[in-house]
A protein has these predicted regions:
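CN hydrolase (nitrilase-like) catalytic-core segments centered on the catalytic cysteine
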Residues: 1-68
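Short gly/pro/ser/thr-enriched loop/turn and capping motifs at secondary-structure boundaries
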Residues: 10-12, 41-43, 68-70, 152, ...
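ATP/NTP-dependent adenylation/nucleotidyl-transfer catalytic domains that generate, transfer
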Residues: 30-31, 56, 83-121, 126-377
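Hydrophobic residues at beta-strand termini and immediately following loops
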Residues: 36, 64, 74, 174, ...
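A short, polar/charged loop-to-alpha-helix boundary motif
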Residues: 67-84
């Protein structure tokens, strides 16, 4: 019998890969195996435990739980574990959610933060981040901050308040409008930049995000709590985020979670208990930085965007191979261009839980400065 002492980090569907490798070893050697695995979060990595044993026939005889420390006695006969009744495995979506919770819990706790702060916008990303934070740390350790502007819809305020009530979280509200107006006055008077010019659109949108980031960091400095950022992998991939704005914080909970997976996780969490108002999930996503704005003004629909990102980043497909999958050439070209153009933003993003085999981290190696062009035309 072989005892394996492992520190194998979680990835989506990683356990199936562990089973396969173990059975291949047993088939080659005829040796039964007890595979023990580390549990806990370490920076971007989450170790899921899920220790198990297999007999010489490659049958699973013992299976410990995921994301929890556990001790189990194993009866051994003839140098192999005696088979026991196994609990039903978790759904993959449940494992993903637990990985995110454990990552937040251990990063916050092990680094000595007394709690966490986040900006609650009334949108789906901040809603999921808040749910994860509360499940990880407890409602008494979390403060949510709503920072509306003239572009914030009234239903965003209502939904944010409802969610805070459902989770029992303290919700602070601070309008950024006075600060935003004063910034624009100073910029116009000191730098002669008219705030209503077309060229100023990006400036005024990013300015709102940076005011919010500054307020959150001020609260963090006052309380000692860590700021959790709420951007998802889809946005970070194509740069649909603001440096020193919504990217400002200490830990990026959804850094490796695509937008389509965000929706699936919201639905999963609400199946346990209703904590995210349905309207948050059903509304068209919007940064609410200008009138009547939606994400799809700037990006392809998320189901298309995420599929292209997964093909290019996750599966290492060429642009031509992605187009051959019946994706629009213009969409493919735009997404790949944005991925490489925004490398500089990703380099400055905070760490976050890694759940996939390619998270723009250790397995992604592209320079910021390069004249290389993906497209020849």
């Amino acid at each position: 019998m072989l005892l394996v002492l492992s520190a194998s980090p979680y990835r989506i569907n990683k356990q199936a890969s562990r089973y396969q490798i173990t059975r291949q070893f047993i088939e080659q050697t005829g040796i039964s195996i007890i595979h023990t695995n580390l549990v806990g979060g370490q920076d971007e990595l989450v170790f899921d435990g899920a220790s198990f044993a297999m007999n010489r026939q490659g049958e699973l005889t013992h299976q410990l739980g995921e994301f929890v420390e556990a001790i189990e006695l194993i009866d051994i006969h003839n140098n192999q574990p005696i088979k026991t009744e196994l609990a039903a495995p978790q759904l993959p979506i449940a494992s993903i959610y637990q990985a995110l919770c454990l990552g937040v819990k251990d990063y916050t706790r092990k680094n000595g933060f007394p709690g966490a702060l986040l900006g609650l916008s009334g949108g789906v990303d901040s809603a999921l981040t808040l749910a994860i934070a509360v499940d990880a740390l407890g409602a008494d350790k979390i403060k949510a901050v709503m920072m509306p502007s003239q572009y914030t819809a009234s239903i965003s305020l209502k939904d944010a308040n409802e969610m805070a009530e459902l989770l029992g979280v303290e919700l602070l509200e601070c309008s950024i409008q006075p600060l935003f107006d004063q910034f624009l006055l100073n910029i116009e008077s000191d730098f002669q930049i008219p705030s209503d010019s077309t060229a100023s659109n990006t400036m005024t949108e990013n300015l709102q995000a940076r005011i919010r980031g500054t307020l959150l960091m001020a609260l963090s400095n006052h309380s000692g709590s860590i700021v959790l950022t709420t951007g998802n992998k889809s946005e970070i991939a194509v740069g649909y985020c603001t440096l020193y704005g919504d990217m400002a914080g200490g830990f990026a909970v959804l850094k490796d979670v695509s937008k389509t997976l965000v929706y699936a996780l919201c639905e999963y969490r609400n199946q346990i208990s209703r904590v995210i108002p349905e309207r948050i999930i059903q509304r068209a996503p919007s940064a609410e930085l200008r009138p009547n704005q939606t994400d799809q003004d700037s990006l392809p629909p998320y189901e298309i965007l995420d599929a292209i990102i997964e093909a290019y980043v996750g599966n290492n497909y060429s642009p031509e191979e992605i187009i051959a999958l019946n994706y629009n050439e213009a969409d493919v070209q735009k997404v790949i261009h944005l991925i490489h153009r925004n490398e500089y933003k990703r380099r400055q993003s905070p760490p976050g839980v890694r759940i996939t085999h390619c998270d723009f981290g250790t397995t992604w190696h592209y320079p910021i400065t390069s004249s290389y062009k993906i497209w020849s035309t």
